[in-house]
């Protein structure tokens, strides 16, 4: 604890008591914020881990299917197939306020412009094998999960940064500001009591 460099006056004592009251209230609010952020962070990390496992597992399967489908086509044919996007995505990114942390919220509108009336993918004049069609369609279906994964991971990063900042502020109040204020208040109260006793002794001597 470090005593503040202030004059031991009653006015200063009242000011320090007001500051202490504010610091204690701020400490509680920051602890509540930290605890709620931790709760949200843990929930998001849990969802992130589950979704990442799902996406990675799906990607491994789709890539294996793609390798097999690609073996049935020439390199030129594969280039032609991927020259035509099967999905068009309009992405709108907003932010959501979570305990003063602005986290991203993605809204995606996904169109399938290159499908026929029955929903089958078409590639202009390119004719691919059915296995390639199914693989490309399956990969395209992963897009919503990939966007959600990006959203969650960015949110986790932002919340982790804010949790660390809040933790430092809580510790600063708990282990420095509040103890220093209490120590200084105690010092001033002792000084004022000493002054009162000295004044009382002088008055008694005068009498």
From Swiss-Prot:
It comes from the Bacteria. InterPro entries: V_ATPase_D. It holds the Pfam family ATP-synt_D. One of its GO terms (biological process) is proton motive force-driven plasma membrane ATP synthesis. Keywords: ATP synthesis, Hydrogen ion transport, Ion transport, Transport. Signal peptide: none annotated. One of its GO terms (molecular function) is ATP binding. Produces ATP from ADP in the presence of a proton gradient across the membrane. Belongs to the V-ATPase D subunit family. This is V-type ATP synthase subunit D. It comes from Streptococcus sanguinis (strain SK36). The lineage of its organism: Bacteria, Bacillati, Bacillota, Bacilli, Lactobacillales. The gene is atpD.
């Amino acid at each position: 604890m470090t005593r503040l460099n202030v004059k031991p006056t009653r006015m200063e004592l009242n000011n320090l008591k007001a500051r202490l009251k504010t610091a204690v209230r701020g400490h509680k609010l920051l602890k509540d914020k930290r605890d709620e952020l931790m709760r949200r962070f843990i929930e998001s990390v849990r969802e992130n881990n589950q979704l990442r496992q799902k996406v990675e597992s799906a990607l491994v399967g789709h890539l294996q299917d793609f390798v097999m489908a690609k073996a049935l086509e020439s390199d030129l044919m594969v280039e032609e197939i991927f020259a035509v996007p099967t999905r068009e995505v309009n992405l709108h990114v907003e932010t959501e306020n979570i305990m003063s942390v602005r986290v991203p919220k993605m809204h995606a509108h996904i169109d399938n412009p290159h499908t026929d009336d029955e929903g089958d993918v078409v590639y202009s004049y390119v004719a691919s094998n059915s296995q390639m069609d199914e693989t490309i369609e399956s990969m395209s279906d992963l897009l919503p999960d990939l966007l959600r994964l990006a959203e969650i991971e960015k949110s986790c990063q932002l919340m982790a940064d804010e949790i660390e900042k809040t933790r430092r502020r809580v510790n600063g109040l708990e282990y420095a500001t509040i103890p220093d204020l209490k120590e200084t208040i105690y010092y001033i109260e002792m000084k004022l009591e000493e002054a009162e006793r000295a004044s009382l002794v002088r008055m008694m001597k005068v009498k």
